Amino acid sequence: MPPRPFTALIVVLIALTTGGCASAVSAPLSAPGPSTSTSRSTSRSRTVSHNVITRVVTFVDSSRSVKYPHHHAIPRPLVTVIRYPAAVTRPLPLIVFGHGFAVTPADYHRLLTAWAQAGYVVAAPVFPLENAHAPGGPDEADLVNQPADMSFVITGMLALAAQRRSFLAGRISPGRIGISGQSDGGETALAMAYDRYYRDPRVRAAAILSGAELPNSQAVYFPRPSPPLLATQGTADKTNRPHFTYDFFRAARRPKYLLRLIGAGHLPPYTTQQPQLSIIERVTIAFFDRYLKGEPAGQAAMAKSGNVRGLAALTAAP
């Protein structure tokens, strides 16, 4: 039996994700993990909205632990919100998304839904100690553990897709995996794609939304080869200062793209602020279309959507 803080977190997340509706709860699903650990996954809910199915699944990494305040350490739970197109059964690219500090994937529901509507399976884990509902309050010291969380979710998602009776059976293309993240989730995704210590070679493209290099990182970023990069940044961001994004963008290898959101701040462009959110949706989809789906038109679509007078400017180094 998981400790009460973890159980409460699942209940809160389901309510935020499904609007309080937890229909069609399925039986537990098993998902084999990497050789150094075991994984368990449990489907918590299923809803359908805007032709996108949303499920909440819990992956458990028994090779690592987490300790909530006033509780003993337990295997690391990764409650994960999964979205995928309702009408598509062929293998699709996978995008794993990392949320920022003191929020949850629910805050980014419009962006993540747009990706799923565009033909992607989208998985967004809730980081155990950085999320808004973490017992005792969010703890940013856990940031260094999050790249491994996202890698573990990739492993769990591929395992589910390989199971004949899974709701994801045959829906994920293992060779077309992208990652993204915003704020601390952007730092997590950046490390997972480009930091030699955390790098996951399964990643084929990365969209870093107002992110930065991990604090006090001594690792070498952008070894050869490096996956294509899209970096986005609000020019008026006072939380993740623009130079953090500009610094890693300059160091990155081609192909790389920088989308500057003129006058935009830190979180709202990715959650509620318009028309910036719509610009983010179009540019990120075009980027993933180009580098995960192999669509040449994606590059022109990025330029068209990413250059909006007074709102956005795209720098491209293909």
Q: What are these model-predicted stretches?
A:
Residues 27-33, 40-90, 96, 121:
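Short conserved active-site loop signatures built around small residues
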Residues 240-250, 273:
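Short alpha-helix in the alpha/beta-hydrolase fold that links the catalytic acid
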Residues 236-240, 266-267:
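Acidic catalytic loop of the alpha/beta-hydrolase fold
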Residues 225, 231-233, 237:
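Short beta-strand/loop motif that positions the catalytic acidic residue
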Residues 107, 139-174, 191:
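Alpha/beta-hydrolase active-site loop
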Residues 100, 181-185, 189:
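Gly/Ala-rich beta-loop-alpha elbow adjacent to hydrolase catalytic centers
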Residues 88-92, 97-135, 238-241:
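Short substrate-entry loop that stabilizes the transition state in hydrolases
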Residues 263, 273-318:
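Alpha/beta-hydrolase-fold serine-hydrolase catalytic core, especially in secreted/extracellular enzymes
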